[in-house]
């Protein structure tokens, strides 16, 4: 059996593979990259582990020796988990970018509270703000309370960064215990969600998208956060889009930083070769968030940085190599819960 790659890997993936192979004490050939599912099915009998962004029922049926489906990022909402359960094939994700994703959440907080984007935009036109007097509210993070919804790898790293800034840290978890529960000032359960929201100056959404977390944040939740700030670094589907837009528009929320969205380009982004601008712009939501002054937006880039490619793909490759030779994989996803 062998490892196969069924998605387009990043530039320079060969070097990342070689390093992962060295860590796993593997000296065999690099894996084939086959993105055409019909072609990949023809190799089904040889596939021991598959690095991919999705998988079909037909491929699972054609790969009787498949020991692991490995996704090179954290989110698994693009997979049909019921089909994997039926096939008895485990799914693993990668947490190799949790540090940079946490950094992005903090960057959104700073951009909002320090008004970095409007100040930069105005100063480019010679317009000064606050040089002699503070004529607008600029919010410091020191001493504030941050509530982290989802205390996994990313949430845990956000916790550590906020601790370094002397912030009070609250956590919202589905289950008691866990690696980071003892590090927060207080951990809340799902039944205490509203109390958690009211106590948090900043709420950071790091939730995976599951049937239980879909529209987890809606009108009532934003009302409980009145005057506070909302950061989403998890999944767009965990938030009621219209409710968030209305809460920002009418001032219920002080502001929001948004990285994951509800609308994405369905085709590769085509750019003008001269200007570099997108030929066919795709707005990221059904509601016009881009018209609101109290929103900072990023195009779902929170998990990407120079170091995250090695982290995500290196961890994925090593896990696939070890699974292919019969070792127990790391970072297995609970196919019932969805994370």
Model-predicted regions and their roles:
Residues 46-124, 135-138:
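Phosphate/diphosphate ligand-binding glycine-rich loop within oxidoreductases
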Residues 134-227:
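Rossmann-like dinucleotide/phosphate-binding beta-alpha-beta segment
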Residues 102-121, 163-167, 314-327:
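Oxidoreductase and adenylate-handling cofactor-binding alpha/beta cores
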Residues 234-339:
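Rossmann-like dinucleotide-binding domain for NAD(H)/NADP(H)
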């Amino acid at each position: 059996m062998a490892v196969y790659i069924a998605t387009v890997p990043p530039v320079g993936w060969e070097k990342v593979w070689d390093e992962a192979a060295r860590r796993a004490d593997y000296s065999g050939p690099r894996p084939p990259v086959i993105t055409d599912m019909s072609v990949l099915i023809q190799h089904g009998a040889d596939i021991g582990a598959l690095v991919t962004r999705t998988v079909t029922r037909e491929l699972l049926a054609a790969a009787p020796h498949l020991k692991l489906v490995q996704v090179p990022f954290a989110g698994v909402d693009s997979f049909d988990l019921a089909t994997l359960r039926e096939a008895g094939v485990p799914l693993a994700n990668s947490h190799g970018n949790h540090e940079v994703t946490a950094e992005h959440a903090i960057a959104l907080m700073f951009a909002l509270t320090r008004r970095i984007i409007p100040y930069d935009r105005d100063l480019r036109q010679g317009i000064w703000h606050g040089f002699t007097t503070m004529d607008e509210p600029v919010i410091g993070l020191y001493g504030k309370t941050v509530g982290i919804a989802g205390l996994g790898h990313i949430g845990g790293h956000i916790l550590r960064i906020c601790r370094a800034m002397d912030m009070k840290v609250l956590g919202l978890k589905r289950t008691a215990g866990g690696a980071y529960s003892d590090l927060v000032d207080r951990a809340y359960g799902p039944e205490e969600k509203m109390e958690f929201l009211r106590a948090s100056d900043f709420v950071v959404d790091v939730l995976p998208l599951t049937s239980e977390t879909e529209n987890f944040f809606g009108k009532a939740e934003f009302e409980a956060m009145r005057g506070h700030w909302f950061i989403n670094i998890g999944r767009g589907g965990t938030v009621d889009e219209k409710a968030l837009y209305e809460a920002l528009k009418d001032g219920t929320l002080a502001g929001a930083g948004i990285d994951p969205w509800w609308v994405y380009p369905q085709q590769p982004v085509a750019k003008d070769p001269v200007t570099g601008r997108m030929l066919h712009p795709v707005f990221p939501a059904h509601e016009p968030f881009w018209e609101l002054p109290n929103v900072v937006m990023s195009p779902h880039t929170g998990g990407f940085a120079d170091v995250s490619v090695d982290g995500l793909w290196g961890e994925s490759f090593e896990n696939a190599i070890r699974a292919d030779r019969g070792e127990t994989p790391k970072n297995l996803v609970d196919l019932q819960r969805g994370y």
